Amino acid sequence: MAWVQLRLNSTNEKAEKISEYLEEIGAVSVTFMDSQDTPIFEPLPGETRLWGNTDVIALFDAETNMQQIVRLLQQKNHLDENTAYKIEQIEDKDWEREWMDNFHPMKFGKRLWICPSWREIPDENAINVMLDPGLAFGTGTHPTTALCLEWLDSLDLTGKTVIDFGCGSGILAIAALKLGAKSAVGIDIDPQAILASYNNAEQNGVAERLQLFLSEEKPTDLQADVVIANILAGPLKELYPIISNLVKPQGDLGLSGILSTQADSVCEAYQGKFTLDPITEREEWCRITGKLNSFV
């Protein structure tokens, strides 16, 4: 069967609404790509997409009147004269198989692997987290998630407590538990993230050691030995009083979701209470880690 593809550029704020409308008017699938043509495959809702602009790609039956589709988008103000778009015929493929073929087991640090459920585990003796990609954020494909996973792998988490602030898919909390943490807490503003984290924890056999809270429902006295927050620079600075108070004395803090150009301003917010390590960078993103000062 032949297909026709519509590709248009959008802001992150509009991409979800455009996707929903495209499905309403007949798209058989809608996917997102970042500006480097990298699929934004992430496992279930729960975290903020970190790309500034997103290409929305819709697949239609070849018989679809694409000019009518364009007119409908224009009528809904999803497409205007300043929006670039492209329509093209594409060859028939096994799209589900091609999607699955994009994902392979990934290694982070010395011990940790993230593996889709349909792939063979590369190393039975390693720490293996089974996680299937969906359309949210947090499988390890983004540099910030990778940086966080590598940091967790570098720590001795044996018997430690961990808080994953902005847990999304739960990937960081689950990885920490598999790496030896005694217990973990996941916190998020999105109920779907809480559900996704629980389901992923169950799949990995660690659900009984993971507590999950919506942000407004977390205990007021909650603290942990290790706190990790992979969100965005703005919220990290705004939520500094809350995040910093989650760390136990002499505890470890890891922050990501930060562009390298934003690192100094985030460090400035946290350096009064934490002794910070050298910043770790990857592509245009970075990770900030440190230890709570004993005199605080």
Swiss-Prot record:
Entry function: Methylates ribosomal protein L11.
Residues involved in S-adenosyl-L-methionine binding: 145, 166, 188, 230
**Which keywords accompany this UniProt record?**
Cytoplasm, Methyltransferase, S-adenosyl-L-methionine, Transferase
Q: Can you quote a single GO CC term?
A: cytosol
Please name the top-level EC class of this enzyme.
Answer: transferase
Localization recorded for this chain is: Cytoplasm
Q: Which reaction does it catalyse?
A: L-lysyl-[protein] + 3 S-adenosyl-L-methionine = N(6),N(6),N(6)-trimethyl-L-lysyl-[protein] + 3 S-adenosyl-L-homocysteine + 3 H(+)
Q: Spell out the protein name for this chain.
A: Ribosomal protein L11 methyltransferase
- What PANTHER family does its record include? ELECTRON TRANSFER FLAVOPROTEIN BETA SUBUNIT LYSINE METHYLTRANSFERASE (PTHR43648:SF1)
Q: Name one GO molecular function term.
A: protein-lysine N-methyltransferase activity
Assigned protein family: Belongs to the methyltransferase superfamily. PrmA family.
The disulfide bonds in this chain are: none
